[in-house]
Each structure stands twice: as structure tokens, then as C-alpha cells.
């Protein structure tokens, strides 16, 4: 295990110290057959379990939206940093890729609204192992950190749900993908519960 400067949104950078296995490169498992990128990249997903990470990892939620011709993933939330927990905004723009068996690729920016100096840009790759689009998804994600953080790689496997009160039978997923989900960190492990995101203030016209 290696202590590194990072916690991940989907795999996405956050400024924190956490233990993740050291890997030399991204090693994507096989993607699900006939994966529909458009159906997956719409609406909201909640992380409910993660192979690695902290409370922040399993408390993450993501929104997908279309801005012009661009598909954007939004991962605003609280991230651990220097012993504290702080709010960051995260935006990932998908790169063109029509090959369904290839990883989804994104360019990402994560920054602190209160401290402009805390900002990083990085590349994210995502492979969907299984999903029914309406209820759950199992995702492998991998990030290469920027030069200022060592240019090393970090990966994770996440269980996502559309609704927190409608969880799927994990036994079926385990048998299908040969995963050990009970060994994953769970949102249920967060004793104090996940923090609510701050409400966004609408700009008023003068």
C-alpha cells in the first residue's frame, strides 16, 4: 500500500491522503457487451460501495449533463484534505469515443471554490463491467495523476445505484462478475452519515 495525495471522484482527483494499491498502469477488465454509452451518461448515480477509498469515496454522487455538444460529469462534493474535509467542484468532459468496448475517456478539472490555488487537471478512464442503466452499475475507473502529484496511476472498482432506497441483489452481481462485494467499503459504514451538499445560490441580476 502506498500513501498518496489523492481521493477519487469516479476516479477523480481530490486532495487527500489515502491508501491505495500502487499500480504501474491502468488494467481495464472486459467491458460489458453492447454497452450503451448514452443511457449510462445521463441522470444521477450514487456510489454505494468501493473497493478502495474513504468515507468520501462512498458518499460520492455524480450527475451527467449535456452542454452543447459536450457530455459533462459533475462530481461536486466533500473531499478529505490535510486532515480536514472540504467542498470541491469537479467537472469531467468526455472525449469522443464511439467504440463501445473501449474505456470512456474524460478530461477533468477539480478545484476549491474558496481557494483558486487548489486546482488540478487530469485524465480519467472508465470501463462499465455491468449495468441495467435504470438501477445499478459496476464501474472500473483509472486515473493518471498530473506531474505535480507524481504522474502515477490509481484505480478503483465502484458499485453505483440510481436510487439509495432501491438497492439491487448484490449476490447476483457477485456471481456474474466474480467480485467479493462484502470486502468493499460501504456507504452503510459511514456511521455519522454522508454530509449534504451545500445549496447553490442563484446569481441575482443587479
From Swiss-Prot:
Relate the assembly described in the record.
Interacts with host coagulation factor XII (F12) (inactive and activated) (via amino acids 1-77). Interacts with host high molecular weight kininogen (KNG1) (via amino acids 402-532).
Q: What UniProt keywords apply to this chain's record, in alphabetical order?
A: Blood coagulation cascade inhibiting toxin, Glycoprotein, Hemostasis impairing toxin, Secreted, Signal, Toxin
What Gene3D superfamilies does UniProt report for this protein, alphabetically?
2.40.128.20
What GO biological process term is on the record, naming one?
suppression of blood coagulation in another organism
| Gene Ontology terms: cellular component | extracellular region
The residues the entry assigns to the signal sequence are 1-18
- Report the protein name in the record: Triafestin-1
Gene Ontology molecular functions: toxin activity
Short name of one Pfam family: Triabin
Please classify the protein's predominant subcellular localization into one broad category.
Answer: secreted
| Described purpose of this protein according to its UniProt entry | Suppresses activation of the host plasma kallikrein-kinin system, leading to inhibition of the intrinsic coagulation pathway. Blocks host coagulation factor XII (F12) and prekallikrein (KLKB1) reciprocal activation without affecting their amidolytic activities. Blocks binding of host F12 and high molecular weight kininogen (KNG1) to negatively charged surfaces. Attenuates generation of bradykinin by interfering with activation of host kallikrein-kinin system.
Amino acid at each position: 500500500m502506498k500513501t498518496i495525495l489523492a481521493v477519487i471522484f469516479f476516479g477523480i482527483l481530490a486532495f487527500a491522503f489515502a491508501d491505495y494499491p500502487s499500480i504501474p498502469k491502468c488494467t481495464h477488465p472486459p467491458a460489458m457487451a453492447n454497452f450503451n454509452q448514452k443511457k449510462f451518461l445521463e441522470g444521477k448515480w450514487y456510489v454505494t460501495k468501493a473497493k478502495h477509498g474513504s468515507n468520501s469515496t462512498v458518499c460520492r454522487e455524480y450527475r451527467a449533463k449535456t452542454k452543447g455538444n459536450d457530455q459533462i460529469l459533475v462530481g461536486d462534493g466533500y473531499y478529505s484534505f490535510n486532515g480536514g474535509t472540504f467542498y470541491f467542484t469537479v467537472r469531467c468532459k468526455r472525449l469522443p469515443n464511439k467504440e463501445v468496448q473501449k474505456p470512456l475517456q474524460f478530461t477533468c478539472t477539480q478545484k476549491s471554490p474558496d481557494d483558486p490555488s487548489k486546482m488540478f487537471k487530469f485524465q480519467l478512464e472508465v470501463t462499465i463491467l455491468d449495468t441495467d442503466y435504470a438501477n445499478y452499475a459496476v464501474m472500473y475507473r483509472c486515473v493518471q495523476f498530473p506531474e505535480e502529484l507524481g504522474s502515477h496511476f490509481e484505480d478503483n472498482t465502484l458499485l453505483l445505484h440510481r436510487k439509495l432506497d432501491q438497492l439491487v441483489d448484490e449476490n447476483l452481481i457477485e456471481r456474474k462478475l466474480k467480485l467479493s462485494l462484502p470486502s468493499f467499503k460501504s456507504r452503510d459504514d459511514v456511521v455519522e452519515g454522508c454530509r449534504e451538499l451545500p445549496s447553490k445560490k442563484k446569481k441575482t441580476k443587479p
